[in-house]
Amino acid sequence: MPRINFIFGIHNHQPLGNFGWVMEEAYEKAYRPFLEILEEYPNMKVAIHISGILVEWLEENKPDYIDLLKSLVRKGQVEIVVAGFYEPVLAAIPKEDRLEQIYLLKEWAKKIGYDAKGLWLTERVWQPELVKTLREAGIEYVVVDDYHFMSAGLSKDQLFWPYYTEDGGEVITVFPIDEKLRYLIPFRPVDKVISYLHSLASEDESKVAVFHDDGEKFGIWPMTYEWVYEKGWLREFFDRVSSDEAINIMLYSEYLQKFKPKGLVYLPIASYFEMSEWSLPAQQAKLFVEFVEKLKELNMFERYRVFVRGGIWKNFFYKYPEANYMHKRMLMLSRLLRDNPSARRFVLRAQCNDAYWHGVFGGIYLPHLRRAIWSNLIKAHSHLEPKNKILDVDFDGREEVFLENDNFIIVVKPHYGGSIFELSSKRRAVNYADVIARRWEHYHNLGESESDDNENQEGVSSIHEIGKRIPEDIRKELAYDRYRRGILQDHFFSANETLDRYRLAKYWELGDFIEGVYNYEVGNGLVLWRRGKVLNVTVDVKKSIEVREDGFSVRYTVLSEEDIEALFGIELNIAVHSIKESPEELIGKRIKVNDKYGVGEFEIVLNKKARIWKYPVKTLSQSEAGWDYIQQGVSYTIIYPINGRLDIELYFREL
């Protein structure tokens, strides 16, 4: 009789730095009940990948889960699939680090009784040159999306078999994940899943359908806990799929013992289809969505979808300069600390992918995820001898200046306003400058008219189908920055400028200093100077920065050739997250802040009274449950009138 082989897999992962209560909820609502129900169905088999971050948490907090997993491995119900231990995008890290990351998770798999030969490719980000690394790491097969194969020119009906792919003479097996199954499981009634699998049944004994997707879909995604567990979807699914004569449940390793891959293919750089939208710059992503919708209106999308391609994952380093800087700092430390065992774990942890990008989850917009990356980068950097240096760390063709002592790392971009873009405390392992800019995202417009695409369907919505509308109170506060956020950004305002216009990015910048190129000289500290124009009057700005044991000091001199009716503002964007601030205008010589659950306590001290504008820097980003309106940090702008010459001293001090 016609049959279909069916491989069912899940991928369990929590980002580095995620809140303990989130881990606990994911465990109680998804990871634990899934495994306990699997134990009830001895004929059901599952390929499971668990990221090393989650493994460490489970071993420390839920050892019973690990014991149950071992038991299921012994019984042959579970096959362990590995990846990089700390869930890096393998294509974005050096080969030496890829190998180390994979070996770490393979070693853990051996500890629980499984010699893993298969790899879950994080975010399914494929590059052909990965083949050599994977084979060197002892990997025999890798799991990617069917979209990768379609991008290589294969038709949908050719995607129910694994294939070989080759690079540099090394060969590996690649399994395609069926996208339709990703959207059916577990969101549609079991009947629909079974019907689809039956439709694939064939006399060809080697034909196989693969589902491998997030384990969080089974209980954590919105509305899924009730659907999957309380209403019995998972039990019904396991029962029916494991007892259906037309469906042959098997593991990847079992398939490869029985059948050979179909042939040889060459896959292009790719990820799953949604990633090609998310990774595009916002304006292009908007056009991409419009194009896809137009094809759907014309009933042409399914036919021509294979030729619809957007961006690649590494585009996020172009889209978000903050992600690029963080990533290039990681590459710098990976290179410098390759032979330092005590620093290596910090580097590997800092390669966790989640904080470097943004799609339907918060990603880079979640401060606690970035904070975890920075914490590990700073701990790794602390193993280097502190010294001042000049290098192009972020590969933009322009040099940055590093000022460093035993307690602080300061990185200045002379070519971008002579501003500080990293102010890292080694004692606290925090980067005070970790404030992401407010950017327009392409879905900010889409949200006005979208509704739940699944409202007339049986089952529950996937997070890709949940409609979102921006609340009006948030919409009226939305603002988009004209420049990256840093520390010591030099503004010139009209004398009658207001805080409200400033914070909503409606003000007029009179100078050309924010993104201007500063000359510089490095000695014990850093001296920067620039001559520019303010209201057609020549103005010179000079600032001398010194790193101190408890922070940094800066001396400003501002000289104008003529008297001008304008204000000079020094903006400091500080990564204050746990104190929910409101816009406020102050007068004084000192700002003292205690961000107890964030960067800690610090103060900004001035040599003379100033007007101070303070406001929270908030971004709007989509998430699995709707909208996140998040305080990324606080902008403190020190303002003085310009009267021919200004001499200002400012001290940032960690308390």
UniProtKB/Swiss-Prot annotation:
One of the record's GO molecular function terms: carbohydrate binding
Catalytic activity: Endohydrolysis of (1->4)-alpha-D-glucosidic linkages in polysaccharides containing three or more (1->4)-alpha-linked D-glucose units
Keyword Hydrolase found: yes
InterPro entries listed in its UniProt record: A-amylase/a-glucTrfase_C (IPR015179), A-amylase/a-glucTrfase_central (IPR015178), Gal_mutarotase_sf_dom (IPR011013), GH-type_carb-bd (IPR014718), GH57_Enzymes (IPR052046), Glyco_hydro/deAcase_b/a-brl (IPR011330), Glyco_hydro_57/38_cen_sf (IPR028995), Glyco_hydro_57_N (IPR004300)
Active site, per annotation: 123 (nucleophile), 214 (proton donor)
Superkingdom of this protein's organism: Archaea
Any Gene Ontology biological process: carbohydrate metabolic process
Keyword Iron included in the entry's annotation: no
Keywords: Carbohydrate metabolism, Glycosidase, Hydrolase
Documented EC number(s): 3.2.1.1
One Pfam family named in its UniProt record: Glyco_hydro_57
Entry similarity comment: Belongs to the glycosyl hydrolase 57 family.
Identification of the protein by name: Alpha-amylase
Organism: Pyrococcus abyssi (strain GE5 / Orsay)
